[in-house]
Amino acid sequence: ICRDTDAGHRELLSAVGEVTLISPFEIFAQQLNAAIYTPLLRAWEDWLVGDDSVDLEKPLRPPRGDWVLCGYGRMGQALHEALSTHNVEFSIIDASGEPQDGDGRRIHGHVDRRTLTDANLSGAVGLVAGTSSDEENLRILLSARTVNPDAFLLVRQNHHENELAFNAAAADLIMQPSLVLARHILLFLL
C-alpha cells in the first residue's frame, strides 16, 4: 500500500509490481461526502480507528448547499468530483490558472476578500481552504471569516508541525493527508 501523490509517482510505482495506491484526497472527498449525507456512518468509521474527537451522539454534520473551493489541485478536484454526485454547486478560486473542468463559477486569482465576495461566499454554506501551502490555507480561513462568519470552514493541514496554528484557527474540520491515509489503512486492516 502506497500513497498516491501524482502521475509521476504512480508511473514509478507501477514498475515495482503489485502496489495498491491510495490517494488521501480521494479518500477524504468520499469521507466528506459521507459526513454530509450519512454523518453517523462517517462518525462510526472514525470511532472505529480511535479518533478521540468523535461524538457518536452528535456526529459532525457539514452542511448541504453551495460551497467555495479555494485551490483546485488534487484535493479541490477530488472534492468537486465526489460532491458533484449530489448536485452540490461550487465556486472555485484558483491562482494557478483556470480550473480545467467542472461546473460552477470559476475565479482566477489569489484568495482575498474580493475573490471570496465574487465567489459568493456570503451565500455559501461552506468553504474549503485546500491549497498545498499551510500558510495560505490559514490566511484563507481568516479572510473567509470576514466575509461569512457562519460558513462551515474546512482546511487542509499539510504539515503536522503546524498543528498549534491550525487548532488556534478553529476551523470546523481539519484535513491532514497523512492522518487520512493512516486511518484509512487502519480501517482497512480491521
Predicted features and spans:
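Cytosolic regulatory regions of ion transport systems
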Residues: 1-190
